[in-house]
Amino acid sequence: MIELVDVCKAFGRQRVLNHLDLAVEKGETTVIIGRSGGGKSVLLRHLIGLMKPDCGQVLVDGQDLARMNNRQLKEIRKSFGMLFQDAALFDSMNVGDNVAFPLREHTRKRRAEIRDIVEEKLASVGLSGVSDKMPSELSGGMRKRVGLARALALDPHIILFDEPTTGLDPLMADAIDTLIRDTQARTGATCVVISHDLAGAFKIAHHIAMLYEGRIIAKGTPDEIRNTEDPVVRQFVEGRADGPIKVV
Amino acid sequence: MLGRPFLALVEGFGRIAVLFFSAMAWAFRPPFRLRLLVKQLEFVGVRSFWVVVITGAFTGMVIALQTYYGFRMFSAESLVGGILALSVTRELGPVITALVVAGRAGSAIAAELGTMRVTQQIDALASMAVDPVQYLVTPRILAGIVMLPLLVVMADFVGYVGGYFVGVKLLGINSGMFMAKTLELMEMSDLMNGLVKAAVFGLILTTVGCYKGYYTSGGAEGVGRATTDAVVISSLAILISDYFLTAVMF
Ligand SMILES: Nc1ncnc2c1ncn2[C@@H]1O[C@H](COP(=O)(O)OP(=O)(O)O)[C@@H](O)[C@H]1O
Ligand SMILES: [Mg+2]
């Protein structure tokens, strides 16, 4: 269970999160939608302690990340996996070493065992036999899938995805969404996915939350969101430029 | 009224110091990342070898030439060996080597860490429960502190040999006198103090490179800015600290 309570975050005068509350159900997928530049990545970074809130609490299983010291943070991060927006693969390492990295850092497994796990994780994202390639040799979709394999390496309980399908062609985007849904179903992990791709969100989400002007203004099942009366959420879901949200 | 630029300078100093001390604290805590250290020793040291040899040799040669023309006016050519040894070991070896390495390795460190920052690789490290300062910064600073003195020993040596070649072989100074004056004027402490300077310069250029890279923002343009800044700031810091180190040591 992850809970954000009254979280604020500002950069200089710009208030990005403004007394935000959000509860993420354990073992389910919550998709957070919202406009570009609306603070979705900032929100996600708070969930893993990469940013600290100016006020409020970030509770993971009842413990407040915002008050943890480095050692405690490090310990709790071992149960997290995160897929970054552009995958953030280490470009000085080949694909196999990227996926092996968390295993080498945090387990005492032997070389052969690590190699087997790496192959298994890569196979589970549909990429076999690319271990020796460098990240720069891969397409965007392949990089994301390698990033996913790396995020899954330690079998995390909580997986965070920052725009996993942005910038991909529709077929690849659908393949990634399917991968996320299957991974969640297989592992029972708690998943938080950031997206502005509504079709994908409806496909993978148990819950959808909308971030608008620094707060979660609506949260519900995909059906509830689809049929909402809230004019702001309606405008976003229908993808219209005119409405309560000022677009330009 | 202190003014904004001054405050920014003080703040920058503070943040560099914090980065440096946390990197050093991590050096004494496991996991010890020997393989990363070796890689950085190679990058900062071994790959600067030839450029340091060449700059060192020509520095020694030009010093021999200049002092010869100067001292000939007083018929004191025999002093060239001693002056050469002193100026190379005390000043030119450490300073020129440090400036060259700042341009070569300091800038590369800033560019590499800057790229990792803007492509979120540093966040990825942290998200995988690896401390990015320990993983990235500590080995680079240690490599600077260890490798600069070794490079400077090399630069001192080829500088002296280059100066000897110009003074004795080209300009005809008596070889025995050249050596005798060297031994008479120079002491072991000159060499050692030069190496202490080298270690400080190594610390400065790697710390500044890491700082600029680690705190890069603003995409590819930001990486470019970090790289240039790293070279400019570390060059200034090397020359300024050289004055104060000299004032304290000699
Ligand atoms: N480290 C930072 N420093 C300053 N401003 C930031 C930082 N991170 C994000 N912002 C600002 O916060 C706002 C929200 O950014 P972000 O969370 O990345 O949006 P998105 O919803 O597209 O992911 C943006 O205006 C961005 O400029
Ligand atoms: Mg974002």
Task: Label each region the model flagged.
Chain A
Residues 63-64, 111-129:
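Conserved ABC ATPase "signature" region
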Residues 134-138, 142:
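Conserved ABC ATPase signature
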Residues 48:
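Helix-to-loop junction immediately C-terminal to a conserved catalytic motif
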Residues 153-157:
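A short, proline-enriched helix->beta-strand linker immediately N-terminal to the Walker B motif
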Residues 159-162:
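Catalytic Walker B motif of ABC-type/P-loop ATPase nucleotide-binding domains
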